[in-house]
From Swiss-Prot:
Active site: 523, 756
Family affiliation: Belongs to the glycosyl hydrolase 63 family.
Protein name as annotated: Alpha-glucosidase 2
Region (Disordered): 1-24, 512-531
Annotated GO biological process: oligosaccharide metabolic process
SUPFAM superfamilies documented for this protein: Six-hairpin glycosidases
Organism classification: Eukaryota, Viridiplantae, Streptophyta, Embryophyta, Tracheophyta
Pathway(s) annotated for this protein in UniProt: Glycan metabolism; N-glycan degradation
Length: 789
């Protein structure tokens, strides 16, 4: 079997050294996460954390087989008890999210339930700790919102401990008759030694428990509900069975209360008989000392927020609350995952099979996530936008996260765009999106972050120690970044010199009005109606310009000119910034807009037809019908893609074409609204059109924060450089910035949520809830912090 190498040479699909297919062979260079800066104190300080973003509240360590903790609770729905555990986008929890989180050792979250408010706080302490990673505490505040007649209805919380390595967990002696302070559970692990979990509360609590021996933590809420149902059938009481299986590695503790309650749960490790200061350690992690510690962390969070973003004198208190929620939820959404991606690899060229995949090597990923309820896993192009915010808060976290992603690169320079690692991540994704295709890329947004870091060094934003760490990181990262660019510059190249197109569009489907381009990140944004190799995508061309220019900057900054690199980055960047060539390929003079090019007709629509399946079954389905012959042409859809040359500042400041872009941006009949810029022009034939029977419009009109941020960034740029249009750019910039901030704050005031995207006509939040991936960029818009080019 043979395949095309990144250089265009024919190479065996099997790597000679390992006899593994190349697609699942790691890139042969030292891993970034093995750098000394990520070891020692740094590694230990980040060992424990709220690294289970898919849970309403969960704690784990950054190790594959961790001791994990989590919280569940019961609510009544349609007269039946329902367990809250995994974050759900569809349930009727009013709102939830981190109000504060520093990404390291502190976070405070509020969850607004039907008749209850839960506040969960997490804090770590190294004072007196002997175990690796330190001690930590959880505080759960329960506030019932019931009236006097209902107040006696119990609130049922379920706190659990589970050992993923199936090490036995020991039940505490006083679980059923809690004292002021009681041991819930204990055990021993190789990483942290002997450990104990203590519960302390001044309130009257009723407790029950059950223990399970199973590696299946994903279905824990189901096991608990089965136990509750069985007990209710026996006794009529909604309580756990107070029993456990032999050698249980999971214990669930039911904590019931009818009053307002504060529950402190402390984890201590590294316990040795000769160090009998347990009472002092527990006291320092509970009660008044815990209150003092949480207040200290709260004050420090606010101080750092002011230091990083300098907003206290610029914005009103309501807007500041949203800014803090943006960074708090971004940092609180950082997760740790471990597992193996599934990579598409056809077993036979003649027939498709569900087994047409190979497993990537076992890998860990430390990353932020776009949305805890909808997308609690790593997405490659999202992560670049995430880190534009995070590096300003904690550059060490950014370096490690970017390093984690680059370490996922295979020998050909490809990185899977969506990371589904481990059973918990797998449980939260539709089956059709699990397998990753090695022909498909994703925008190289990580280079936006790396450019920012280099510019930060040039403008002396970092101290000497951090500067040295960034330089050390870039020195090791360069060979991987070089391979990544090489993969793009060969696998995604078009027919014409200087042209590119996103591979992976379905050219045989008749179920989509316009075949999606998932690899572009813009999914259903309209492209050429009939995908083929003649396509030219203006957004990818601009991403490649960014990549080439970034690599050239890194090469010059790091003095890498004396080493062998695969590309002449200076020449490629010059080619892709050639304004005349760009206009020849993509500019439509009639509309004053940059457009894709491809085999296209506007004469397509979805129609209902009766379809006979292979088994003889007859069904009525929406299928695409084409009524006009497609031809090679510019694709007449104005929207976010049209503004990429503007976003990447390829347009000269004195060009009349810049004036045309400003007119398009500010035209209320095109993409302008009082809430932000629309993803697709109102004049487009596919504006707000369904792409299939079940695919609602996604990037066909809705307002998305990442693209608004990039456009706003360039408006800011063009407003500050010399040129005939700078005052016009400034006026548009100020109004767009004001519209975006006002709308996000208004929605947050009404719903307590930052949303995935916003409605194009009303500005209401839509899509995934708690989308504090790139929607959190609203904080950088507030602080007017933009990437430099």
């Amino acid at each position: 079997m043979t395949g095309l190498s990144p250089s265009g040479d024919i190479k065996p699909l099997l790597d000679d050294e390992s006899q593994r297919p190349r697609v699942i062979t790691p890139f042969p260079s030292p891993k970034l996460t093995d750098l000394s800066m990520f070891q020692g104190e740094h590694k230990e300080s980040l060992y424990w954390g709220t690294y289970r973003p898919q849970m309403y509240f969960g704690v784990r360590a950054r190790t594959p087989k961790s001791l994990v903790a989590g919280l569940m609770w019961l609510v009544m729905k349609d007269g039946k008890p329902v367990m809250r555990h995994f974050c759900e986008n569809s349930n009727d929890l009013k709102s939830f999210g981190w109000k504060e989180h520093n990404g390291r050792d502190f976070g405070r979250q509020e969850l607004f339930e039907q008749n209850m408010v839960l506040e969960t706080s997490f804090v770590k302490s190294e004072e007196g700790s002997l175990g690796y990673g330190g001690d930590w505490s959880i505080r759960i505040n329960v506030q019932n919102m019931l009236n006097d007649d209902e107040v006696k209805r119990s609130t049922h919380l379920f706190f659990y401990l589970a050992d993923e390595g199936c090490n036995g967990v020991n039940l505490g002696k006083d679980v059923l008759r809690l004292k002021e302070s009681s041991v819930l559970a204990s055990g021993s692990r190789q990483d942290v030694g002997n450990w104990q979990m203590h519960l302390k509360s001044q309130n009257h609590l009723e407790t029950h428990y059950c223990g399970f021996k199973t590696p299946d933590i994903v279905n824990l809420s189901g096991l608990v509900q089965q136990n509750l149902t069985a007990q209710e059938e026996k006794s009529g009481l909604l309580q756990l069975s107070d029993s456990s299986e032999d050698s249980s590695n999971i214990y669930v503790f039911q904590i019931s209360t009818t009053n307002q309650s504060t529950i402190d749960i402390a984890f201590v490790s590294g316990i040795k008989e000769e160090t009998s200061n347990m009472e002092n350690r527990i006291m320092s992690l509970t009660g008044l000392p815990l209150s003092s510690l949480l207040e200290e962390k709260h004050i420090a969070f606010n101080a750092k927020f002011n230091e990083c973003f300098n907003l206290s004198d610029k914005l009103d208190p309501e807007t500041l609350v949203v800014g803090k929620a943006a960074i708090g939820n971004m940092l609180g959404g950082i997760g740790y995952f471990y597992g193996q991606s599934k990579i598409h690899f056809p077993k036979s060229p003649l027939a498709k099979s569900e087994d047409d995949f190979l497993l990537y090597w076992p890998a860990e990923l430390y990353t932020a996530v776009p949305s805890r309820p909808r997308f609690p896993r790593g997405f490659l192009w999202d992560e670049g936008f995430h880190q534009l915010l995070i590096w300003r808060w904690d550059v060490h976290i950014t370096l490690e996260i970017v390093g984690n992603w680059l370490d996922l690169m295979n020998i050909d320079g490809w990185i899977p765009r969506e990371q589904v690692l481990g059973a918990e991540a797998l449980s939260k994704i539709p089956k059709q999106y699990v397998v990753q295709f090695p022909s498909n890329g994703n925008p190289p947004t990580l280079l936006l972050v790396i450019r920012d870091l280099i510019n930060g060094i040039r403008t002396e934003k970092f101290n000497e120690a951090d500067r040295d760490k960034i330089l050390s990181f870039l020195d090791r990262a360069f060979v991987r970044l070089d391979a990544w660019f090489k993969w793009f510059n060969t696998s995604q190249i078009g027919k014409e010199k200087g042209s590119y197109y996103w591979h992976g569009r379905d050219n045989i489907t008749n179920r989509e009005l316009n075949p999606q381009s998932l690899s572009s990140g813009l999914d259903d944004y309209p492209r050429a109606s009939h995908p083929n190799e003649d396509e030219r995508h203006v957004d990818l061309r601009c991403w490649m310009y960014l990549a080439a220019d970034s690599m050239n900057s890194i090469q010059e900054f790091m003095g890498k000119n004396d080493i062998l690199v695969t590309e002449d980055y200076s020449s490629i960047a010059k080619l892709l910034s050639d304004f005349t060539l760009l206009n020849q390929m993509h500019y439509d003079k009639d509309h004053g807009a940059y457009l894709d090019f491809g085999n296209h007709t506007e004469e397509v629509r979805l129609v209902w037809k009766e379809v006979i399946h292979e088994d003889g079954h007859l069904s009525r389905e929406l299928v695409r019908e084409t009524y006009g012959k497609p031809e090679l042409r510019l694709v007449p859809h104005i929207g976010y893609v049209s503004f990429f040359p503007f976003m990447f500042r390829i347009i000269p400041a004195d060009s009349s074409i810049l004036d045309k872009q400003l007119d398009l941006i500010s035209n209320g009949n095109i993409v302008w609204s009082d809430y932000g810029l629309l993803s697709l022009a109102k004049t487009s034939s596919l504006y707000m059109k369904y792409n299939s029977e079940h695919q609602a419009p996604y990037w066909r009109g809705a307002i998305w924060m990442n693209m608004n941020y990039m456009i706003l960034s360039s408006l800011h740029h063009y407003s500050t450089v010399d040129g005939p249009y700078n005052s016009k750019a400034r006026t548009i910039y100020e109004e767009l910035r004001s519209n975006l901030i006002r709308n996000v704050v208004r929605n947050y005031d009404q719903t307590g949520i930052i949303w995935e995207h916003y409605d194009q006509t009303k500005g209401t939040g839509e899509g995934a809830r708690v989308f504090t991936g790139w929607s959190a960029l609203i904080l950088l818009i507030m602080s007017e912090e933009y990437p430099l080019f």
